Amino acid sequence: MAFVEHDPQGQANAAAFVEGLGALNWKEGSNLRIDWRWGDSDPTLMEHYAAELVALSPDLLLAGSSSLATDVLRRRTGKIPIVFANVTDPVGQGFVASLGHPGGNVTGFSNYDPVMVSKWLGMLTQLTPPVANVAALYNPATTPYAALLLHAIEEAAPSLSVTVRAATVKDDAEIELVMAGLAREERSGLLVLPDIFTSGHRDSIIALAARYQVPAVYPFRSFVAAGGLMFYGIETSETFRRATGYVDRILKGAMPADLPVQTPVNFKTVVNLRTAKALGFTIPPALLVAADEVIE
């Protein structure tokens, strides 16, 4: 319910979900009906669609790829099972009592592991020239879990000899101010936090990073495919495919309260050599060897 309908990543997630269900013998038009809603990264639209979906009295709700989608659905119903596919801090946001024992009508798949944060910073420090000053870009209105990520970033920074700061934004103009400020600093770089705002403003962020020659690590592979520099994290389409296992179990009688929240299993590194060259940075051989995908 969070993605833009025509976004390639949103379509890949939807396809993986349908394929995963098919492998479990759930076929649309036969024994399954799926009512799709695309929130287009718009909180107001997502509230509207949440009300629509709950009014349909479905057997299950899939909160597709954002904490906000999970929250708006959870506030609408305490009875219909909800499976989330991409939430950063389900305990901190009150979606579940604990990862091991959710205890309510909500469970699903987290997109966060503490190792990710040190990896993000490490990728920036491995560049030539290395980055030493990092801004973490996000919109506080749509990133209620920002404190968790910022705390982890601040804890990882000293061991990498990096200084970090929060860069809060709410529109393209403020994104440009952040980029312009980083361009005036020496050895500066950017972490783009996972957030429906940053996903919705992906093209602007990438274009401004290119204009101001700011190296950045992005939260999803789709950013690097669209011209961003580097990505480390999970493939969201894989998480949607994994989510079908819980959907299958719940439709067969399992209770969300009894299904532990699953954490990431596989991580991928993607680098864009073309973008590195345009920005004036060199990707070290060790990082290229470790990368799962190199865009040339």
Q: Residue locations for each model-derived region?
A:
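Short hydrophobic alpha-helices and adjacent helix-cap/hinge residues
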Residues: 1-296
